[in-house]
């Protein structure tokens, strides 16, 4: 069986919950590593007041015993501390409070309210909120645990805030990863981070918001994960879909995908082989993916995040109830959440990679999967 999951919960409800199925038995789960990723998601220069309230941690309810997966479905919850301040407004048992009708451009408010026949966009924005990515990150941490067992590591780096973008072509080194994790902008260049902070400060001062981009990397993937056979099995399509499913992500680039103005001999990666290394490339312009499959080079995927639509200086809109012109309603929000989005990006990429590896190598016990990967790697050398 491959991986699947469902989540439920609202931004200010009691909890965000998930049920995940398909993890092989015997996988060791480091609970502190799960919570560490949740804390990483809360960090970042430009975040709003919500992050000062929440201290996210995952509570596992089923599917593990003694820190090991049992092969049964895994249930977990991330509790919302802020629910106490909103319980009269978002209670499952009663409806109260002012209706949210001043729908915000750039959000799900208007389309969701019209689609579901709602007179209060609160029911849309509570579920559409990026707060739901807390449980996504917890699920991604489980996928990372499986990937690590199979020799695959996933990390990320912010590469743009506003118009200031960089194009590193290789995964960060261990020292660079340490610097990235220590940075409030998730980057290993402090001079660049200072420029970005100034951009964020400027937007905050004028009541706006600012977007950017991040790269997600994966190392240790064998050649041939994914498939060329059907579009829905192509790993690049699955990764792009997973990243575009994250709130506010508007575009995805695989490798040097936007650099298509180059001639072919400057865009593709020549193939080499030697007995010790197997197949290898001098360059990685493809970002580790060719024909819908991994090519043995590090995976490199870039996601572009739009500016957060909720702004202190709002745009014009229409009131859902009266159809009269008005200003969009302000809800507590971030000025910039690109560093947090990078952590979410790691999670969804890790999930898709873990799923693709299980599709190829199967196994109800984690040791069976590991041995299958090792045997395959030896065969294709």
Swiss-Prot record:
Entry keywords, A to Z: Amino-acid biosynthesis, Aromatic amino acid biosynthesis, FAD, Flavoprotein, FMN, Lyase, NADP
Residues that coordinate or bind NADP(+): 41, 47
Cleaved signal peptide residues: none
Catalysed reactions, as listed in the record: 5-O-(1-carboxyvinyl)-3-phosphoshikimate = chorismate + phosphate
Top-level division of the source organism's lineage: Bacteria
E.C. no: 4.2.3.5
Pathway assignment: Metabolic intermediate biosynthesis; chorismate biosynthesis; chorismate from D-erythrose 4-phosphate and phosphoenolpyruvate: step 7/7
Swiss-Prot/TrEMBL GO biological process terms: amino acid biosynthetic process; aromatic amino acid family biosynthetic process; chorismate biosynthetic process
UniProt key word Flavoprotein: yes
Cited Pfam families: Chorismate_synt
SUPFAM superfamilies, A to Z: Chorismate synthase, AroC
Top EC category: lyase
Cofactor remark: Reduced FMN (FMNH(2)).
GO cellular component term, pick one: cytosol
GO MF entries: chorismate synthase activity; FMN binding
Binding site for FMN: 127-129, 247-248, 291, 306-310, 332
Cofactor entry: FMNH2
Family: Belongs to the chorismate synthase family.
Function: This reaction introduces a second double bond into the aromatic ring system.
Quaternary data: Homotetramer.
Name under which the protein is recorded: Chorismate synthase
């Amino acid at each position: 069986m491959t991986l699947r999951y469902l989540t439920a919960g609202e931004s200010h409800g009691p909890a965000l919950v998930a049920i995940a199925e398909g993890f092989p038995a015997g996988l060791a789960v480091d609970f502190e590593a799960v919570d560490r990723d949740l804390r990483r998601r809360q960090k970042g220069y430009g975040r709003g007041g919500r992050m000062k309230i929440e201290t996210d941690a995952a509570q596992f309810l089923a599917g593990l015993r003694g820190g090991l997966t049992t092969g049964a479905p895994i249930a977990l919850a991330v509790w919302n501390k802020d629910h106490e301040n909103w319980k009269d407004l978002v209670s499952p048992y009663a409806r109260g409070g002012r209706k949210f009708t001043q729908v915000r451009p750039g959000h799900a408010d208007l389309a969701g309210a019209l689609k579901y026949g709602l007179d209060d966009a609160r029911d849309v924005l509570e579920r559409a909120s990026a707060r739901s990515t807390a449980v996504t990150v917890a699920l991604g941490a489980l996928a990372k645990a499986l990937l690590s067992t199979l020799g695959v590591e996933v990390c990320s780096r912010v590469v743009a805030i506003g118009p200031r973008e960089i194009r590193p072509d290789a995964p960060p080194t261990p020292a660079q990863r340490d610097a990235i994790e220590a940075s409030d902008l998730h980057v290993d260049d402090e001079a660049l981070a200072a420029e970005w902070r100034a951009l964020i400060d400027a937007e905050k001062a004028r009541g706006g918001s600012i977007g950017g981009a991040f790269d997600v990397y994966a190392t240790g993937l064998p050649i041939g994960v994914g498939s060329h056979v059907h579009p829905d099995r192509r790993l690049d399509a699955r990764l792009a879909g997973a990243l575009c499913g994250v709130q506010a992500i508007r575009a995805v680039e695989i490798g040097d995908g936007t650099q298509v103005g180059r001639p072919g001999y400057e865009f593709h990666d020549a193939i080499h082989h030697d007995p010790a290394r197997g197949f290898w490339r001098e360059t990685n312009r493809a970002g580790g993916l060719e024909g819908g499959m991994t090519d043995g080079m590090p995976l490199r995927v870039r996601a572009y995040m739009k500016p957060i639509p909720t702004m202190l200086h709002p745009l014009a809109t229409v009131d859902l109830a009266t159809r009269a012109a008005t200003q969009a309603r302000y809800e507590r929000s971030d000025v910039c959440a690109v560093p947090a989005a990078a952590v979410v990006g790691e999670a969804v990429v890790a999930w898709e990679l873990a799923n693709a590896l299980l599709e190829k190598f199967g196994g109800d016990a984690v040791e069976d999967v590991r041995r299958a990967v090792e045997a395959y790697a030896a065969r294709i050398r």
